[in-house]
Every structure is written in C-alpha cells, then in structure tokens.
Amino acid sequence: MKLTHAAIAVLTAVVTGVGGGAAAAQATNDHRETGAQSLPSTAQTPQDALSEENVIRERLYFDVTGHSFTRVDPDQAQTLGPCTGETTFTDVLPRRGVKRIGSKLVGVDGPYVVEQLAQTRSTREARATADEIVSLVNECAAVAGGDFGYGDPVTVQSNSSREVVYFPAYDSDAAAGGYVVFSVGARVGVIDVADDVSTAQVAHLAKEAANVAGM
C-alpha cells in the first residue's frame, strides 16, 4: 500500500509518541522499501520463458495455408531475411538481457518458413527492434538479380503492446509469401515465408504467430 507524505508524517508522530524515534525511522525505511518495490518498471516481461510453444509449428501453418511442412532445426547463422544482406537477427537485438529461439518448416521442392523470436527486457525494446527491422526491409524492397521483391508494408495490428506488420512477396508478379515483423509485449519476431501463398494467408499467419508468441 502506498502512503502519502502527509500519512507518513502522521504515522511518524504516532509511532514516536509510543515507541520513540527509532520506531518512526523504521516505519519510514519500510515505506521507502515498499515504495521502491512498487515503482513501475519498463522491464516487464511474460512470466513463462520462451519455448517451442511460442513459435509456429507444422499444424498451425497447415491450418492457415493448407500446405504440409516438416520442422527441422534452424540454422544458427540464419540471416535476418532474404534482402538484408549478412545482417542477422542478433545484430538488431538489444545487447543485453535477450533470449532467442527459432523454428524452420520445410516443404517439398524448396518452400520454407523461418521464424526467429526473441525475448527482450521490455515492451519498448521489442517495439524499437521491430521498427528497425521494418525500416531495414523497407529499404530493400527488391532482391538484386531476380524478379523477386517485396511490396509496401501492411500493418495488421497496432496498439500500445502489439504491432504486426508484413511485406507481401512477389516473384514475377505472382504472390510468393511474405515477410512478417511483429512485437508483442517484450517479445519481437520475424517470419520469412518463402511459399506460394496469398497475401491474405500471410496476414492471417502473422496474426496467429503473434498470438502464439505472446502466450
């Protein structure tokens, strides 16, 4: 329970009258400790640690797209995305207090889905990281040497604790998946969908992935 300065003064006077100045000092110290513990923190994070339950899996992807994929261990040196050069997910994350996990789904004849997810120390850190990634991908709308490229970013959800954005991908003007960036609470993630699915399916997958990441 927080006490006002006036309440502290009254409490001090009462305690001093009964038990002396030492008791009053102890009451004041107790209040300070309680107040310090109750101060709001920008480092609020979900209670549960990251796990495989927080990343998309074969069943979820099938439910959204109707495409069957097999899960494999992701490459630890996975780059951020197909058009951001050698930049990795780690390169854009905060330097301290971060835990990462990942997932890779592989289909027949080449299609794949790679998700990279991280737990930061605060909602602010996660949102700032997501915004930086959106900027990086927005600057490289096309991949040199081919017909593959991204369209303009589309915001699926945006509020104080959640942001979900995707870039529709095209190959020779045909829909070819997309790139998802999201932050939910103190978590931030990206999903590279290299599959011939529609933009509506990518948008649906983006929302579902954010929901799963925030569990």
Predicted features by range, described:
Residues 26-100, 206:
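N-terminal "mature-domain start" segment
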Residues 186, 190-215:
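Surface-exposed amphipathic alpha-helical segments
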Residues 100-131:
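A short acidic-to-branched-hydrophobic micro-motif
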Residues 100-106, 176-183:
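Short, surface-exposed beta-strand/loop micro-motifs that present aromatic residues
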Residues 1-28:
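Secretory targeting and sorting signals
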Residues 120-125, 156-161, 184:
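A short, structured loop/turn motif at beta-sheet edges
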Residues 125-136, 205, 209:
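Stable alpha-helical elements in mature extracytoplasmic
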Residues 68-78, 131-178:
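Short Gly/Thr-rich strand-loop-strand
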